[in-house]
Amino acid sequence: MVENHPFEPWLPENARLLMLGTFPPAEKRWCMPWYYPNFQNDMWRIFGIIYFQDKFHFVDVEKKTYRLDAIKKFLGEKGVAIYDTAQQVIRTKNTASDKDLQIVQPADLDGMLRQLPHCRAVLTAGQLATKVFSEHFGIKEKPEMG
């Protein structure tokens, strides 16, 4: 079954960084309806540690979710855009793993970057996101992943 991306790109006008993942996990794994929604994923905890020396800065511990308003405010202030490299996928297994995703339609990376005139850097989160981005832009030398 083909899945469409459930979220709109987050593209603040002042974005200098575009973070690209591959595709969100299945909705049953979400604790919030936005990027990096799985409570087991540490992305928002890592941001809390780096910027606030507090891994719970974006976490609502009691409700086992993330504080979405605080995340959006923070990303807007810092100039961070977020989306994924896939617009449509097929999950070959019932997992959230990139290795079990077949990309049916990649995201419109060119269109996204045109909407971000101040963007100076792109961060790809994961091997498949890196592969899709690199192939799209003809980047032959890929960074080491670990």
Predicted regions and their residues:
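Active-site and ligand/interface coordination hotspots across diverse enzymes
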Residues: 1-49, 53, 115, 120, ...
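Glycine/proline-rich loop-helix segments at beta-alpha junctions forming the active-site rim
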Residues: 2-5, 9-12, 86-146
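Hydrophobic/aromatic beta-strand patches that form the interior of the parallel beta-sheet core
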Residues: 18, 81-83, 123
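Short amphipathic alpha-helical segments, especially helix-boundary/capping motifs
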Residues: 19-23, 84-86, 107
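Gly/Ser/Thr-rich helix-start
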Residues: 22, 80, 127
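Short, electropositive, low-hydrophobicity segments enriched in small/polar residues
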Residues: 25, 83, 130
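Short, surface-exposed acidic-centric catalytic microdomains
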Residues: 32-101
